[in-house]
Amino acid sequence: MAKHAVNGIDIHYQIDGDISDKTIMFSNSLASTLNMWDLQIEHLLAQGFGIIRYDSRGHGQSEAPKGPYSIEMLADDAAALLDVLDIESVHFCGLSKGGMVAQMMGVRHADRVKSLIIADSAAFMPSKDTWEQRIQAVTGGGMEAVVDATIERWITSSGRDRLPGQVELIRQMILNTPVQGFVACSEAIKAMDMRITNPK
């Protein structure tokens, strides 16, 4: 694992395998770190993929500067990390917030992506009140105020019963998310609208 100064902040990242035409860059969801991809890495390395993972601005071991953030800014962070690593282009995979970053990579940095893999994401968030409630909850009560509800959304009840160890890892990942980073990224998600910029 390493850090680089990227787009004005230090970004924490990890490279696994060999960087090649089969390199995938992973962008994590809100309230998670690059470790959310741990279970996929061994399988992908066995297929010859190189892997770049990073902690988003405001998350994990990356800096969490005061907001505002935007999805454009988060995509520019990813592109700037590719610059400092001297990597021309990658297959870009994003989950949830990371999927929003993937879409914006396609809009702002199309020459840096060979393909986009967008999982459980959206181009627009109509439920502004929901995001405002989460922001207010975390601002007043820290990440403890949203951790249980987040786990219930992310993992089915049967999954929670079968994989208690994984659930606890995810719980700690959420709890360790900096409040300032969570709030600023939530504001970015709330404000996002790529329905016009995305090609039909």
Where are the regions a protein language model picked out?
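Flexible "cap/lid" loop of the alpha/beta hydrolase fold
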Residues: M100-R108, R112-A145
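Conserved alpha/beta-hydrolase catalytic His-Asp/Glu region
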Residues: P126-D129, G140-P199
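Active-site acidic short loop of glycosyltransferases
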Residues: V6-G8, I19-D21, D83-S89, A110-D111
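Conserved donor sugar-nucleotide recognition element shared by glycan-biosynthetic enzymes
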Residues: S70-A78, S127, M143
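Conserved HGGG/HGGXW glycine-rich cap/lid loop of the alpha/beta-hydrolase fold
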Residues: N7-E63
